[in-house]
Design a protein with these regions (language model features):
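Active-site neighborhoods and metal-handling regions in enzymes and metal-associated proteins
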Residues: 2-466
Length: 466
């Protein structure tokens, strides 16, 4: 971690310590040393929004039916799918059940999802207090109301093996799909505990435990379904992107109002996003004159100065869903040296975005073709482009993120949601700021007719001062 200008590293825990001790209504100024430039004139933190599960029983039934249809395909032929406690992110469990637990506090939910719709979907969560909480949230009128899903205060390999046997999944030849066993996006070796898997195999001899994720168009029973967002999911992502834009606006306002450190920008965005979403974000990383991913999602003590270009990776989570935005902004006014270069770079990126959106033909364009079109757009403009052409959007860290190979063969379909985040470093010898990388990223929804933005902000150049 980088060192702050005062000599010490700034951690997210330190940033939150004062607020945790005093309460969410703590004045923002009190989190900074007395006399700190950004501590002057700050008001109260925003009131936090308390959210409850929003997806309808109809949405549950849609997901379950679609996942079960893929489980029945000959190449998968799965009798059930399980998620395990060692997957503490719990994205697949949340997709199937809406149940989530605070990360790192306890094991993730263990789900037994049978292919047979007559069988109950079981969710093992680690304590009675968690069962009571989720019964309250998902009970009357919710996903638990009709008895098709049930919660148990258990966790671990032995509890899961016992449940599988009780539900009739102990017969020789049974095929159980294990979520996150391998082939996952950020964890290619999986998230399943070897000890837990050994317990299942020794307790249930003759039962096959197999992966359910793979790269390419036949992505697996959960990944393939999750790629295409339903209207309900689209509304949740739209809300998440709106929160992203509020976080971006808060960081810009902090720079305008005298922030002196990157940490001040980060904190302004964090408090705004967390308060509106009511849950932790997926990604908040801010760089000054470098990539938005340069600070690995933490506040640091890098100095804020006029003439810098601030780039971010911002992805709130609402109901667990997120879609990233990126919008480099200029710290200073249009008369500050470096602004002309920044504006020229944004103009190039706007042209690339326009060409990219027009290129998408639902049901025809592949993600590989889309990325090649972006490379060609930069070449046509005689500029050095970069950045990810396709980045995931959806629940947690789900796909699609295009990578060399099979995933580029996936065809864009209505409901697919992803981040398009090109960047550019202009060849402008002699211009102030020349060579700095500028990024403009937006969350995209593929529709029946083409593609639209999830966001509503202006995509043009932004200067913090006039």
């Amino acid at each position: 971690m980088r060192k702050a200008s005062g000599g010490g590293a700034i951690s997210r825990r330190q940033m939150l310590r004062s607020a945790t001790a005093t309460g969410v209504a703590l004045p923002l100024a009190q989190t900074f040393p007395a006399g700190h430039a950004y501590a002057q004139g700050q008001g109260q933190l925003p009131e936090i929004n308390v959210t409850l599960p929003v997806f309808t029983v109809a949405e549950r039934d849609r997901r379950w039916a679609a996942v079960r249809a893929i489980m029945a395909r000959p190449q998968w032929n799965l009798d059930a799918i399980i998620t395990v406690g060692s997957d503490r992110w719990g994205n697949n469990a949340r997709y199937l059940t809406q149940v989530a637990l605070v990360r790192y506090a306890q094991p993730g939910p263990q789900v037994l999802f049978p292919r047979d719709p007559a069988k109950t979907v079981h969710v093992q969560i680690s304590a009675t207090r968690h069962v009571n909480s989720w019964n309250d949230r998902l009970g009357p009128g919710g996903w638990l109301a009709d008895g098709k899903m049930a919660l148990q205060a258990e966790t671990g390999g032995e509890a899961l093996a016992k449940l599988l046997a009780e539900e009739g999944f102990d017969r020789r030849g049974t095929r159980i799909g294990v979520a996150k066993l391998k082939g996952t996006r950020f964890e290619p070796e999986g998230l399943v505990s070897a000890t837990l898997l050994d317990t299942l195999r020794s307790s249930l001899p003759g039962v096959a435990f197999v992966p359910i994720e793979q790269w390419g168009p036949d992505a697996g029973p959960i990944d393939e379904v999750a790629l295409a967002k339903s209207p309900e999911e689209q509304e949740v992502i739209r809300r998440s992107v709106a929160i992203n834009e509020q976080g971006l606006a808060a960081a810009i306002a902090a720079a305008r109002n005298g922030a002196t450190r990157q940490a001040d920008l980060w904190w302004a965005a964090f408090t705004t996003m967390f308060a509106d979403a009511g849950e932790d974000f997926i990604r908040l990383s801010i760089g000054l004159d470098e990539g938005g991913n340069s600070n690995i999602g933490e506040p640091v003590g890098d100095a804020v100065r006029r003439g810098q270009i601030c780039t971010q990776e911002i992805s709130a989570a609402f109901q667990g869903y997120g879609c990233q935005i990126n919008h480099s902004f200029f710290i200073g006014s249009p008369s500050t040296p470096g602004y002309d270069y920044y504006r020229a770079a944004i103009d190039v990126l706007l042209k690339v975005h326009e060409k990219a959106m027009a290129f998408i033909e639902p049901g025809k364009t592949t993600y590989g073709e889309f990325e090649e079109n972006t490379r060609q757009s930069f070449a046509d403009l005689n500029e050095q482009g970069g950045g990810l052409g396709v980045h995931s959007g959806g629940i947690g860290q789900c796909r699609v993120r295009s990578r060399p190979g099979e995933d580029q063969k996936i065809v864009m379909q209505p409901g697919h949601s992803f981040d398009f985040k090109p960047s550019v470093s202009l060849r402008r010898a002699g211009m102030a700021g020349a060579g700095k990388r500028v990024q403009l990223g937006e969350s995209i929804l593929v529709t029946e007719e083409g593609a639209v933005r999830y966001g509503s902000r202006s995509m043009g150049p932004i200067a913090t001062h006039t």
